[in-house]
Amino acid sequence: MTNVVIDTKPVWGNMLPQLKWKDGTVVISEDDKHNEPYGIGKFFNFKEDFTRLYFKAIVNNPRERKTIEALISLPRSVADVCNPGGVYLGGRTLVDNVAKKFATIKASVDANGKVGYDTSDLERLGVRCRYYVDDLVKDDALMRRILLENKWKSKYPALVKPYEEYQRSKPKTIVLPTNRNNPVRSNVDIKPVNPPSSKVVKTVETDERLKDPPHTGALKTLIPLQKPIAPVQISEKPVVVKPEIKSPSKVIQTPDPQTVVAGKIIPNNESADSRSLFGSPVLLICVASLLLLIIIL
């Protein structure tokens, strides 16, 4: 497995776990090329483990006056700079023969108030970390820092090919057309099973036991797809067949409607004998006279 040794940029906070710091002053210079003081700042809220540091600097110069505040997270040890995935190989972490109680820090302040920290009267610290290539290319945070350098390929040539292979092997999100809301992570391309054609055929591979002796490969039969026939549903309950008895229908004859002409009833020829008895006016007069006589007596 290939190893890559990376010289990280100096981080002034690496010295804090090994130096007994208290509240002290900081000399801020305008940039790395100038040594004249740009402002005076002060450290506040030191903790024994030096993992969090509140830094407040008041910048005084003829052109501007501003207050810079920053909350800095510091590593517990120098070896934490190489984590995760790295092995600390050493480097200058302490300055020999430091007579001052408080180290002097210089920084460059831009127009927006951002401060870039660096050691001033101390020699630049080079922290060397060893990484395994397979683990290094998977460390997104560290790779982002390496990729910021324009000449990272020439500086770390052993990283080029493994990093490109890792990028190609990353799983990609494929959204199936059948369900757009369901992302499926896959490393292979999804292709249709049957290519589009005018005739849709289905390839069926026969069983090995059905092969003819002369043939060496499995038989392949082309069966055209047909529409499935709907099965006939058979009821499990017994069907009772009742014989149908036809009864003679009764014919109900209704009298034909009578024809009315000018207020007179013209009887039909078919019902003439049924109305002949009561249709005579002489008989009606006799019956009426008999009834009247009975009432009088």
Curated annotation (Swiss-Prot):
It is a single-pass membrane protein. GO terms for cellular component: membrane. The chain crosses the membrane at residues 277-297. It comes from the Viruses. It is found in: Membrane. Keywords: Glycoprotein, Membrane, Transmembrane, Transmembrane helix. Residues 176-185 have a biased composition (Polar residues). Belongs to the ascovirus HvAV ORF18 family. This is Uncharacterized protein ORF18.
